[in-house]
Amino acid sequence: MTVVGLIWAQSTTGVIGRDGGMPWRVPEDLTRFKQLTMGHPVVMGRRTWDSLPVGVRPLPGRRNIVLSRQIDFMAEGAEVFGSLEETISNLETEPEMWVIGGEQIYRLALPLATRCGVTEVDTYLLHEDDDVLAPVLDDTWVGVTGEWLVSCSGLRYRLHSYHRS
């Protein structure tokens, strides 16, 4: 059975996206993202796919899967499926997969996930109407939180690793 992991970066107020992108720059988070997802399928929604810079779309070294309800949607270099169930059945031989966004896909995958990798960026963002918010982890999740670190961009961040208890 394929292990389902979720990975995201969020502000201290739970914002993971704003205006079609991430509202901060923390290169160390991208390094961690690459370390955890490299060699594994990454599953994302169409808007997350569209938000990836053209130069790294599809994400290299990973099987890229885009979920879309739009029947004729095509994503060059990626596979497109209409549901998470269809995706998982096509990944049954894979040891693990990572869900990389967005909000709707996290919500669908959260009940199936057994691990989460979260980068918390020490920035306070008031919620705006179109913000994308991080999933809320309930008390079935147990986490380990690292110390605050300072990014080369000057922002403080810390890493959280969660698994189902």
UniProtKB/Swiss-Prot annotation:
InterPro entries: DHFR, DHFR-like_dom_sf, DHFR_CS, DHFR_dom. NADP(+) binds at residues 8-9, 16-21, 45-48, 67-70, 100-105. Its EC number is 1.5.1.3. One of its GO terms (molecular function) is dihydrofolate reductase activity. One of its GO terms (biological process) is tetrahydrofolate biosynthetic process. Keywords: NADP, One-carbon metabolism, Oxidoreductase. Substrate binds at residues 7-9, 29, 62, 119. It catalyses: (6S)-5,6,7,8-tetrahydrofolate + NADP(+) = 7,8-dihydrofolate + NADPH + H(+). Coiled coil: none annotated. GO terms for cellular component: cytosol. PANTHER family: DIHYDROFOLATE REDUCTASE. This is Dihydrofolate reductase. The lineage of its organism: Bacteria, Bacillati, Actinomycetota, Actinomycetes, Mycobacteriales.
